[in-house]
């Protein structure tokens, strides 16, 4: 089963990826993990990626696609994979189609965990972090016992700059602009399935299971 998981920040994509990985035993492959592995193993492409990353530059498509191809050719992907964070553009999506064809593979589903923008803003702006131990809370979904205070060590909880309302709205706007052409691409190919992510995480996963059981 070869899957791509898509969703905006705060949609709960990471949670669903972990559940898919656990139930179906297919590797959850994120772009960051792929880069780290290639750099750690000292592959030619890993060295090239490191050069760009060390300079704070974006890694070019040809290097990224090469690293993806190396990763998908590994033994643990023989029975499937779950891609997360790649592709990010329609050009990368086209390159992925080509490299999968070279490997004798194809995509089964592109699962889009869809959550209304206002809900994403609520989820992201409600996050609070303990600066001492790193424990994460949410003012609505996972509040501390005492408002604004960490349950574990009594530290004053903080809101990260990234989670300020204006920053969150800007980040979502950029992501929506980048993601829509990709969703259209996979819709046209017949791979795209949308799952309503604005529900309990177990209910969302049941929907994903019902899609995957059809395969």
From Swiss-Prot:
Compartments in which it is found: Cytoplasm
Residue span of region NMP: 30-59
Assigned keywords, A-Z: ATP-binding, Cytoplasm, Kinase, Metal-binding, Nucleotide biosynthesis, Nucleotide-binding, Transferase, Zinc
GO molecular function, one term: adenylate kinase activity
Gene Ontology cellular component annotations, sorted alphabetically: cytoplasm
EC number annotated for this UniProt entry: 2.7.4.3
Record note on quaternary structure: Monomer.
Record-linked NCBIfam families: adk, PRK00279.1-2, PRK00279.1-3, PRK14527.1
Protein name: Adenylate kinase
Species this protein is from: Oceanobacillus iheyensis (strain DSM 14371 / CIP 107618 / JCM 11309 / KCTC 3954 / HTE831)
